[in-house]
């Protein structure tokens, strides 16, 4: 299932889905590779598991994305953690570190 988040109902459905998981994959899509460029930005963020993916427009759903990183107490799996976490940090989103 691929779900593009477009409505508040989609957000509610996402958080319900998230509550059933203890581990999720996270990926970002950005405007380029260089996080130090003046016009660099995150465009999309995807959250998923082996069967489902949720796609968020970063600018539109920024508050929901911040809430996701604050509320979710499970494990984040990043394809390229160094880059994605740096890109999110550049946008003011802190990814919590857990041991």
How should each PLM-predicted stretch be described?
Residues 1-99:
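Conserved RNase H-like, two-metal-ion catalytic cores of nucleic-acid enzymes
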């Amino acid at each position: 299932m691929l779900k593009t988040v477009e409505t508040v109902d989609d957000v509610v459905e996402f958080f319900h889905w998230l509550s059933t998981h203890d581990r999720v994959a996270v990926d970002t899509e950005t405007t380029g590779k260089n996080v130090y460029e003046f016009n660099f930005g995150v465009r999309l963020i995807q959250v998923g598991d082996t069967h489902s993916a949720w796609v968020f427009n970063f600018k539109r759903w920024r508050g929901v994305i911040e809430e996701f990183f604050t509320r979710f107490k499970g494990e984040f799996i990043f394809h390229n953690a160094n880059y994605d976490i740096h890109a999110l940090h550049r946008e003011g989103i802190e990814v919590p570190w857990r041991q």
